[in-house]
């Protein structure tokens, strides 16, 4: 694992004991317990309890920091960003799309998924109709119209 949060780079080394020890000696830094990674997995780090909306943003791993208000955590070597922000939904979707990714509102509420272009939305409608003709599986879960 590779994560940047709270002005610190967190690296989780995995593998055989000898390989991990050699990598640890080469990289240096502080050795910490697994607690950080467990708190990240369970969304118990301080970021997740801050006020604002929680966003899960998938981007190319080399995408730059997003210029948005709020706190960011960069995970998966840069490909996954957690953002706690009060920024406008459309602004977050636009910035994620312009960086080659997409944003999903993770906090409760409607409309968390990025708006789909009309042709792709029609495809989703047709697929949903084929797979769920009675409309019983998660109606309105991703998009109110589905």
Can you say where each PLM-predicted feature lies in the sequence?
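Conserved glycine-rich FAD pyrophosphate-binding loop
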Residues: 6-7, 28-146
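A conserved active-site cap/scaffold subdomain adjacent to cofactor or substrate pockets
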Residues: 1-33
């Amino acid at each position: 694992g590779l994560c940047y949060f709270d002005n610190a780079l967190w690296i989780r080394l995995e593998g055989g004991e000898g390989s991990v020890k050699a990598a640890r000696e080469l990289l240096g830094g502080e050795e910490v317990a697994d607690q950080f990674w467990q708190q990240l997995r369970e969304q118990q780090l301080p970021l997740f309890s801050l006020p604002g909306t929680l966003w899960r943003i998938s981007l190319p791993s080399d995408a730059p920091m997003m210029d948005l208000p709020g706190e960011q955590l960069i995970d998966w070597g840069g490909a996954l960003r957690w953002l706690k922000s009060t920024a406008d939904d459309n602004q977050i979707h636009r910035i994620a799309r312009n960086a080659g990714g997409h944003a999903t509102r993770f906090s409760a509420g409607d409309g968390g998924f990025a708006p789909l272009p009309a042709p792709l939305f029609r495809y989703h409608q047709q697929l949903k109709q084929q797979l769920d003709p009675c409309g019983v599986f998660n109606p309105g879960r991703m998009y109110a119209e589905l």
